[in-house]
Regions:
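Generic preference for flexible, low-structure residues
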Residues: 46-52, 81-86
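A generic structural micro-environment signature
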Residues: 17, 42, 53, 66, ...
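A short, N-terminal amphipathic alpha-helix
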Residues: 47-63
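Intrinsically disordered, low-complexity segments
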Residues: 1-2, 70
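Short beta-strand-loop/turn "lid" adjacent to the catalytic site in phosphate-handling enzymes
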Residues: 58-90
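Short, low-complexity, polar/charged sequence segments that are solvent-exposed and flexible
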Residues: 27-28, 52-56, 88-89
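Short glycine-rich, Thr/Ser-proximal phosphate-binding strand/loop in the N-terminal lobe
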Residues: 2-51
Length: 90
């Protein structure tokens, strides 16, 4: 069985960096990682489609995501990414 995954999202002024960390025996190791451009006007639906496509391309089942951590230095984007996480992983 595949281990569960922590999804880390770091929203910066220029880029959004996303990484997955697999939980193995209590320790996380970096799995896939991606870098997207930060766009303040993107909707949660658009970002959700993008994130789902990245997961599909990497062969990651979104149901494996057990936890999501989001950090942001761009306050207007935080609620958008929170909605993405709630829609895809709750």
């Amino acid at each position: 069985m595949s281990s569960s995954v922590l999804l880390a999202i770091d929203i910066g002024n220029t880029n959004v960096t996303i990484g997955t960390f697999a939980y193995d025996a209590g320790a996380g190791r970096l799995g896939e990682h991606w870098r997207l451009s930060t766009h303040r006007e993107e909707t949660s639906d658009e970002l959700g489609v993008t994130l789902r496509a990245l997961f599909d391309q990497a062969g990651i089942d979104p149901r494996r995501v057990a936890d999501v951590i989001i950090s942001s230095v761009v306050p207007p984007t935080l609620p958008i990414w929170e909605r993405v996480a709630a829609k895809l992983f709750d």
